[in-house]
């Protein structure tokens, strides 16, 4: 079954963003996980960039510890700030300041953009509202919509399941970058003895990708 034939539910709309959005950097994944965090914890639908900055940056900081390549660009002030924070070179306050200034420049505009036109039309014809509204110009933040709260606060287990799927997709993109492969060309194999998923790098060496299992299901 083609993905566009799947029922256009909020869960599948989220999956479309995670699966088919652009992956020139991992900011989309960090933002997605941050949105899950704030939708569960916030008492207001208005989230300032200052409040969103720390959970957003910390997700990226955590991934940088095991996957240094988080962007196809080599000159990101935001990523450098996360690296500096991990190394103890800057404070949490400095990390938040840099994240607020540099970390949201493109990701908020790009988050809901799905590159596959058929998927985009399939969901936008049925789901009449995105997961957040950009209010940086007037309120220095974003406003969470009912769709986000329905998805992660009302529906049972959605936060847990989609959080893991987002994490797994992030791991898979990292692995593709590590192998210097297009993320759609990662050949997945299964070792019957160890019960682990693996692929091969450009030198035909085995590389484990079991951490990406959630993104490969289905």
Regions found by a protein language model. Give the residues of each.
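Mixed-charge, low-complexity interaction segments
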Residues: 1-217
């Amino acid at each position: 079954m083609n993905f566009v034939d799947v029922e256009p539910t909020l869960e599948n709309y989220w999956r479309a963003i995670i699966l088919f959005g652009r992956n020139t950097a991992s900011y989309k994944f960090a933002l997605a996980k941050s949105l899950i965090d704030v939708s569960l914890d916030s008492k207001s639908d208005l989230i300032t960039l200052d409040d969103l900055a720390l959970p957003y940056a910390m997700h990226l900081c955590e991934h940088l510890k095991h996957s240094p390549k988080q962007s196809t660009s080599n000159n990101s002030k935001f990523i450098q700030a996360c690296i500096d924070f991990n190394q103890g070179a800057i404070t949490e306050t400095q990390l938040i300041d840099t994240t607020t200034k540099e970390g949201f420049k493109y990701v908020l505009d790009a988050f809901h953009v799905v590159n596959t036109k058929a998927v985009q039309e399939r969901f936008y014809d049925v789901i009449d509202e995105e997961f957040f509204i950009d209010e940086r110009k007037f309120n220095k933040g974003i406003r969470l919509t009912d769709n986000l709260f329905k998805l992660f606060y009302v529906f049972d287990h959605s936060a847990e399941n989609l959080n893991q799927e987002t994490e797994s997709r992030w791991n898979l993109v990292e692995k593709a970058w590590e192998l210097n492969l297009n993320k759609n060309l990662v050949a997945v194999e299964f070792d019957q003895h160890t019960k682990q998923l693996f692929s091969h790098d450009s030198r035909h060496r085995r590389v484990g990708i079991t951490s990406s299992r959630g993104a490969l299901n289905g």
